[in-house]
Amino acid sequence: MAKHLFTSESVSEGHPDKIADQISDAVLDAILEQDPKARVACETYVKTGMVLVGGEITTSAWVDIEEITRNTVREIGYVHSDMGFDANSCAVLSAIGKQSPDINQGVDRADPLEQGAGDQGLMFGYATNETDVLMPAPITYAHRLVQRQAEVRKNGTLPWLRPDAKSQVTFQYDDGKIVGIDAVVLSTQHSEEIDQKSLQEAVMEEIIKPILPAEWLTSATKFFINPTGRFVIGGPMGDCGLTGRKIIVDTYGGMARHGGGAFSGKDPSKVDRSAAYAARYVAKNIVAAGLADRCEIQVSYAIGVAEPTSIMVETFGTEKVPSEQLTLLVREFFDLRPYGLIQMLDLLHPIYKETAAYGHFGREHFPWEKTDKAQLLRDAAGLK
């Protein structure tokens, strides 16, 4: 592959779909705090003046879903009716059932290690050495832009900003290496009083320049800041939001494949979530060990069965040891059975709400971002 462009996007915590994701994961965290063995599948729908929380939850815990919802919306920043959505006055509806006993009998086992997968499915994990966090650069910097938007909105640097925002970054590659940034898009909701020129200048100086490395920006880099000219109506007033609709933003920005399953609102018995985290952990440790420059892991499951139905390692020709050896190393050093990976990554804790905005991968404090097996893999592979 010679010269090419690659684009990834992200959305802020105030985007309607991300509001829904954060509410679903806030409910999950509140339940796990009381009942780590709970079964949770929590879906959220948001629209002007309304939040609907539904799903299947089996737990001994009691949580106040209305209070959790209002607090989450309040933390995001929707606290006044002039934003079209207000944590203090929106209606909160709840439609929660219990997990089907047919599913439950396939998951629970007397021996925890034999815990079956909560569903069939395929999951991918990915890592690349093109950034310090072993993530693709386009999605990494797209996330950082909208994180910065939230930071300068909340700390009062740009008080006319509102919670809804989107970013998009197009990188230039030459023979697989980054040579620059071709285009940057940043659209942010704002209050009525700010004019377009002032907004564009402030966004450039306070959001874009502090985040994007200067060596990747040239006179040819194109910037599109609120290109429609106005973004006052946003959030759930502009679009309805739904849990699980930003699965590419949540993962690798399109740089790696995706099995199709969303993450937010699901407890770790759901392999859609936990096995995708484990696959990232495996891929990141392989790259951190220097066994490959890029690595994609696929793992698949059958409902009610503990052992994965398949494990695949793809290194795109960048491997330093034979691919067959990599697969054997994965099977030796990583327990990818549902209970095994829950234990390996210590997933039965309320750690999920923070994952629900700005990406599930690439932030070092999450347990699946550890590289604690890199040296073991390197030694076992015989690399000096």
UniProtKB/Swiss-Prot annotation:
The keyword Aminoacyl-tRNA synthetase does not apply. ATP binds at H15, D164, A165, K166, R230, F231, D239, R245, K246, A262, K266. InterPro entries: ADOMET_SYNTHASE_CS (IPR022631), S-AdoMet_synt_C (IPR022630), S-AdoMet_synt_central (IPR022629), S-AdoMet_synt_N (IPR022628), S-AdoMet_synthetase (IPR002133), S-AdoMet_synthetase_sfam (IPR022636). Changing K246M: Loss of activity. Modification in protein conformation. The keyword Protease does not apply. Keywords: Acetylation, ATP-binding, Cobalt, Cytoplasm, Host-virus interaction, Magnesium, Manganese, Metal-binding, Nucleotide-binding, One-carbon metabolism, Potassium, Transferase. GO terms for biological process: one-carbon metabolic process; S-adenosylmethionine biosynthetic process; S-adenosylmethionine cycle. Disruption phenotype: Cells are resistant to methionine-analogs, such as DL-ethionine(Et). Its main location: cytoplasm. Pathway: Amino-acid biosynthesis; S-adenosyl-L-methionine biosynthesis; S-adenosyl-L-methionine from L-methionine: step 1/1. Changing R245 to H/L: Loss of activity. GO terms for cellular component: cytosol. It comes from the Bacteria. Its cofactor is Mg(2+); Mn(2+); Co(2+); K(+). GO terms for molecular function: ATP binding; identical protein binding; magnesium ion binding; methionine adenosyltransferase activity; potassium ion binding. CDD domains: S-AdoMet_synt. It is found in: Cytoplasm. Changing K266M: Unstable; trace activity. Belongs to the AdoMet synthase family. Homotetramer; dimer of dimers. The active sites are at the interface between subunits; each dimer has two active sites. This is S-adenosylmethionine synthase. It comes from Escherichia coli (strain K12). The gene is metK.
